[in-house]
């Protein structure tokens, strides 16, 4: 695939007022979400739930793409249409999560490195034929006593860059996601320092491995107080710190940045994104790639009556997409 096509896909992913829905939970993660609302974790229930999300009427008004899990990209709607085809036909770009999860980094207590590079080229080739046009790889950076280490940051940046280079070789736009985890009692200043170091390392690694930034999307965590921090930063502080950190680390040529919600409440994640747009003078589009913050309320309602609440649950998904789409333009009113 040409650089032009990669760039075109990347730009479509961050089209004005649109974001990406993350529905790439692994089977074990969706099991936790389902058990929380009393749904049995069967393959058919997972398929039906993903169909509920993806067939929401007019979803593409505010959603440009969706990140799928391996199982989902192989599944079909109840009418027998492969999900990836259904999405493409309805103006939503199919994406695929390709990492194999974060594992303990040997010799570095409390730190993780993401696995999944072995055999990745062949997997990406298959995903492209299944209809995927972008991929996602998540690195996990924990904040704690004396961590993260430079070694951990570098190991994850290197893996993200290897993955990104392989994606572009196979015609997929790489979404690179170095998530600085909210857990902990650290303050917003500490989060800023760690996020800045992580992004500097990442973009250095992408440059070294000849990754074309015009065909790459960053999925970033916001600069925010740790969940256990006594002093929680205000919406304005989070927006200002996040934008300042991104401006100091992310090249302006990148087509766009989407944020993960990372354990924020539905309203917090929307308010923070909206506030960033009040600052003006942004070098790149800032949008959203939320999972839980898009799905939680709808899943709860659907679980109570899978048939009777179907349309209502889809209405909630549409409303959440609309709220975040407006926030991605700075027009959300709260």
Swiss-Prot record:
Transmembrane segments: none annotated. Keywords: Glycolysis, Lyase. InterPro entries: Aldolase_I_AS, Aldolase_TIM, FBA_I. It comes from the Bacteria. Pathway: Carbohydrate degradation; glycolysis; D-glyceraldehyde 3-phosphate and glycerone phosphate from D-glucose: step 4/4. GO terms for molecular function: fructose-bisphosphate aldolase activity. One of its GO terms (biological process) is glycolytic process. Its EC number is 4.1.2.13. NCBIfam families: FrucBisAld_I. PANTHER family: FRUCTOSE-BISPHOSPHATE ALDOLASE. Belongs to the class I fructose-bisphosphate aldolase family. This is Probable fructose-bisphosphate aldolase class 1. It comes from Xanthomonas campestris pv. campestris (strain ATCC 33913 / DSM 3586 / NCPPB 528 / LMG 568 / P 25).
